[in-house]
Amino acid sequence: VYKDKEYDLSEETEKKFLRYHSKKGLERRKALYAYRHAEQNSWIYKTLLEKKKLPLFKKCSKLLLVGSGLYPYSLFDIHKKFKHIKMLGIEIEESRYSASKQLVEGGPARDKIKILKLDGIDFDYSRLEDDDLVFISCDVDSDDIYKKVLETSKAHVYICAPYNRQWMKDSIKKSNLIYDKDGRIISP
């Protein structure tokens, strides 16, 4: 009885309620987990770090990542460090777009990060200003997109990939793996 009205909660209704809310809760938990455990100092950050241009993040108001992928961990990493930046991930492939959008919309960065299903060449970069940043994933065929950004916008544009491979060499040394002269692992 609630407000003088009697409700009959059948077992079937209760199961539907629990099934709906457990799935909704699961999506939220996945999104929070993805946000919290996103790689620190990911590719976007490393790209500017290696070029010694980290101060660009402080002045930036909009950041775009072309080829944001299945899991936009780089955008999550930047959101944790620079809350003032509005970010946009552009992804062309439907399944990666859907998964990425679900992670963003269920997490704490949903007001600052948006994911679009679009080819990077079709995006209008003309509204970007001097302090804005565009990163193109190394997985994307970047030549045409790079030219378009340079021709139509004032934004800084970078290919989001390591330029200096020293971090990779350091990681390999820390792994304690032994390699033969052909680069194959010979001991765990």
Stretches found by the model and what they are:
Residues 143-188:
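C-terminal substrate-binding/active-site "lid" region of AdoMet-derived donor-dependent transferases
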Residues 59-71:
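Conserved class I S-adenosyl-L-methionine
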